[in-house]
Amino acid sequence: MAGNSIGQLFKVTTFGESHGIALGCIVDGVPPNMALSEADIQPDLDRRKPGTSRYTTPRREDDEVQILSGVFEGKTTGTSIGLIIKNADQRSKDYGDIADKFRPGHADYTYQQKYGIRDYRGGGRSSARETAMRVAAGAIAKKYLREQFGIEVRGYLSQIGNVKINPETVADISKIDWQQVASNPFFCPDPVAVEGFGELIRELKKDGDSIGAKLTVVAENVPVGLGEPVFDRLDADLAHALMSINAVKAVEIGDGFDVVEQRGSEHRDEMTPQGFVSNHAGGILGGISSGQPIIAHIALKPTSSIMVPGRSVNLNNEQVELITKGRHDPCVGIRAVPIAEAMTAIILLDHLLRFKAQCR
């Protein structure tokens, strides 16, 4: 399995499985002399960790991160930073039933066909539990971006199923109520939508089913010039990073698929001596950041781990009926907000370091 790393100058490599002893990552390229401790990383992990609300999986993990290397006397040394999180609340017995069966909609079938072996306990390496280390690495990137460049990377949930936020609450990026986002379990800026989300999730849990979601990531104060045309365009790398998150099925930059119905006279972001008039492009032009806020949206599918019986096959290609046991999120999009922030921050810092290495 060769796809465990992302980034060039700021590079993150993760390892570990859902029901293994621990999860870990190596972060290369962190500049020296940045103050760093576990306390800088833990808050983002706490936002992602399971068992924090009645709307997510009941699996409980403290997700306490430990820095193993790359920090001396409270400051980064410029060498590889090793991070580890111990797994604690595994219940592997929940998965004994599917040792020889493929959960429909999961990676079970493709992992088995590709490698001839798979860790069936909670999905092993294919589990979203792996993303804890992305969030840990992303917290380091977010701290450096904020302290050295004033760049803020934040996200919010905009839709679960057919319940959407009022678009007026996010029409002006500079006026998004980030305190409201931080104060509810859905990372949502619209208190009315929060009520609707809660009602929908309670209904789904009663039915033993799941639902998809859409979320948005906003990066503010990004300077002009990030991105390496033609193949390493900033939007291409962002799409790559965001699509690598479990359950993500679509990525939009700026207006995304809405551009299909727009005319050129509407979509083009006109300019005046005072700056851009609009931001349909989502802060990226020609694969290079324009200095406007970078806006990306992702859509996540409903998890296939549900209590509703479904048809599948076993290792012998025989028909079976499957009900997924274990503890699962009714909507994986809820805990994906800090993950999407992390992946965005990792890409932005990587491109900032590349920009500094070759440009004025």
Swiss-Prot record:
Name the source organism.
Actinobacillus pleuropneumoniae serotype 5b (strain L20)
Q: Which gene encodes it?
A: aroC
Output the superkingdom of the source species.
Answer: Bacteria
Protein name per Swiss-Prot or TrEMBL: Chorismate synthase
* Family matches, as Pfam families: Chorismate_synt (PF01264)
Binding partners and assembly: Homotetramer.
What SUPFAM superfamilies does the record point to?
Chorismate synthase, AroC
List the GO cellular component terms.
cytosol
Q: Give the UniProt keywords, A-Z.
A: Amino-acid biosynthesis, Aromatic amino acid biosynthesis, FAD, Flavoprotein, FMN, Lyase, NADP
Cofactor binding, note field:
Reduced FMN (FMNH(2)).
Q: Which residues bind FMN?
A: R125, S126, S127, N246, A247, G286, K301, P302, T303, S304, S305, R327
Give the UniProt record's GO annotations in the biological process aspect. amino acid biosynthetic process; aromatic amino acid family biosynthetic process; chorismate biosynthetic process
Question: Which positions does UniProt annotate for NADP(+) binding?
Answer: R48, R54
Name the EC number(s): 4.2.3.5
The family annotation for this protein states: Belongs to the chorismate synthase family.
